[in-house]
Amino acid sequence: MNLEKLFGSKTKVDILKYLLFRRQWVSMRALESELEWTFPAIKKQVESLESANIIEIDKNSTGRSITLKAEVSQLLKELLYFGLKSELINLFSTYEFMIEKYFFGKCFEINLDMDLIVIYKNLEKPQIDKIKESISEIFRWYFIEIVNVVFMSLDEWNKRYRLADRFVLDIMRTRQE
């Protein structure tokens, strides 16, 4: 999913991701330093988001604090997680002969201890490291710095499944809910 095309601006998408996944009650100057966009670009997009009733700007004597409106916050979060999920699926499809299956977890509001579980076949450590780095880059693009990813070989997965391992059974149970 191309969020820039949906929202019409990379700056606007970065502001929304920042407000959803990093912090709220932030000033335009703080956004400028964190997002590395120019102040005029941020000001223009903040005004656009405010006129669209997506954000609120609390103008007090100490400055301006920007927050997402509560009524749109959950919808935006679902949309951005859909975009995140789509990018991960695209990444995994490039390795379709090496990745047997994958499961989305905690950060996708699925009741698992991990955020992402990847079951692989025919992968060596350098390939695993490359995929892990790509996964981290995708999450960082959404301003999600900490992500819990488990890589497990297909042989280990099958062995743990046969032994009724709790971790594997929890994953299978959440898939059926």
List each model region and its residues:
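Catalytic core of pol beta-like nucleotidyltransferases
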Residues: M1-E100, K106-N111, Y120-E177
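Conserved beta-strand/loop subsegment of P-loop NTPase cores
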Residues: L116
